[in-house]
C-alpha cells in the first residue's frame, strides 16, 4: 500500500464524522511508555495509517533524508489547546501533544498498489516534564508496533523506480540516539513543524488548501505569521539551486549545526537563517552561498 496523504485523509474525514474514536491522552502524559503503539489509540486502522479524530496528517516542504524511506507524519494536540507560533522555530505545542512519524518502504516504487512495509513509528510526546521520544518497531505481520528502548536493526528490501532491488539494514534508533537530533540547548524538542516548512498547499476533502490555514481551522495552531519565508523544496528543479541547497542543509543538518544544537562547537551553522561568512564557511550572502 502507498500511504498517500490525500487518500487516507479523505477516508479518515468520513470516519471521523462518526466521532467513535479518541486518543488516549493519559498514555501520552504518563511517566511510562506503552509497550505497543496501539495503546495510544492514534489510529482507526494502524496498518493503513488511518488516523482518528483530531490526529491530523501533515507534510513538510523539505524533509530529512532517511535512506530513501517514505514517511507519514501526524500531529495530535489536546482539545482546547493550540500550538503557539515561535519565530524561526517550531510551534510551541502544549503538554499532551504527540508528534507521530511512521517510516516505510514501498514494495516496488513502480507500482505503489503492491503495498508497503512499515518499519517503525517514532513518537515525540510532550509530558509535564518536557518532550520525550521513543520508537516502536513493526512486526512482520504489520499488525502492531512494539516499543524498542534499545533500538533495533531491520533487514529489508524494496524495488526503486528504476527497477533495481535495494537491500537496506534499517536502524531503529535507541532512546539516547533520539537526543542526537532532537536536542536544543540540551533539552529535547521537535524540529520539523516550523511555519516556514509547513507553508504549502494540500488537498482536503477534494479541495486544495494551505496547510497552515487548515491547521489553524482545526485548532492545532493559534496563528499564521505574515510574510513567511517558506523553505524551498529541495527536489524542485524549477527553484534556484542555492535555495534548494540551503533548504536541504537546514533540514538535514541545521538542527545540530546551530548555536543551540549539539554541533555548536564546530561553529559551522547551517540553519535556515545563518548568513555569516564565518559560520557558513562560504560567502557573505545567501544568494552567493552556492
Predicted regions: what they are:
Residues 1-9:
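Bacterial N-terminal signal peptides that target proteins for export
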Residues 23-72:
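N-terminal pre-domain segments of enzymes
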Residues 32-35, 244, 248:
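Extracytoplasmic/secreted proteins, especially bacterial periplasmic and envelope-associated proteins
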Residues 64, 71-79, 85-247:
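Extended surface/linker regions that mediate inter-domain or inter-protein docking
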Residues 175-191, 251-270, 276:
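Periplasmic/extracellular electron-transfer cofactor-ligation site
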Residues 278-287:
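Conserved small/polar residues in nucleotide/adenosyl-binding loops
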Amino acid at each position: 500500500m502507498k500511504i498517500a496523504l490525500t487518500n487516507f485523509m479523505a477516508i479518515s474525514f468520513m470516519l471521523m464524522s462518526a466521532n467513535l474514536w479518541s486518543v488516549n491522552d493519559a498514555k501520552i502524559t504518563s511517566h511510562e511508555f506503552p509497550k505497543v503503539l496501539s495503546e495510544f489509540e492514534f489510529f482507526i486502522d494502524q496498518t493503513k495509517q488511518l488516523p482518528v479524530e483530531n490526529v491530523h496528517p501533515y507534510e513538510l516542504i523539505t524533509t530529512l533524508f532517511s535512506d530513501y524511506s517514505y514517511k507519514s507524519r501526524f500531529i495530535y494536540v489536546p482539545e482546547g489547546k493550540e500550538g503557539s507560533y515561535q519565530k524561526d522555530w517550531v510551534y510551541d505545542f502544549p503538554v499532551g501533544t504527540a508528534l507521530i512519524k511512521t517510516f516505510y518502504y514501498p514494495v516496488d516504487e513502480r507500482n505503489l498498489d503492491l503495498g508497503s512495509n512499515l518499519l517503525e513509528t517514532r513518537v515525540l510526546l510532550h509530558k509535564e516534564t518536557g518532550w520525550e521520544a521513543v520508537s516502536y518497531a513493526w512486526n512482520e505481520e504489520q499488525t502492531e508496533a512494539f516499543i524498542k528502548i534499545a533500538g533495533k536493526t531491520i533487514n529489508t528490501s524494496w524495488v526503486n523506480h528504476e527497477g533495481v532491488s535495494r537491500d537496506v539494514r534499517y536502524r531503529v534508533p535507541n532512546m539516547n540516539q533520539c537526543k542526537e537530533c532532537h536536542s536544543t540547548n540540551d533539552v529535547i524538542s521537535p524540529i520539523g513543524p516550523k511555519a516556514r516548512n509547513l507553508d504549502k498547499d494540500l488537498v482536503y476533502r477534494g479541495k486544495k488548501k494551505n496547510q497552515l490555514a487548515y491547521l489553524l481551522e482545526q485548532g492545532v495552531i493559534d496563528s499564521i505569521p505574515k510574510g513567511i519565508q517558506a523553505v524551498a523544496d529541495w527536489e524542485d528543479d524549477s527553484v534556484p539551486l542555492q535555495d534548494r541547497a540551503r533548504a536541504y542543509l537546514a533540514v538535514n543538518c541545521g538542527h545540530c549545526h546551530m548555536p543551540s544544537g549539539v554541533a555548536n562547537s564546530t561553529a559551522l551553522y547551517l540553519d535556515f537563517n545563518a548568513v555569516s561568512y564565518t559560520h557558513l564557511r562560504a560567502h557573505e550572502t545567501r544568494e552567493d552561498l552556492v
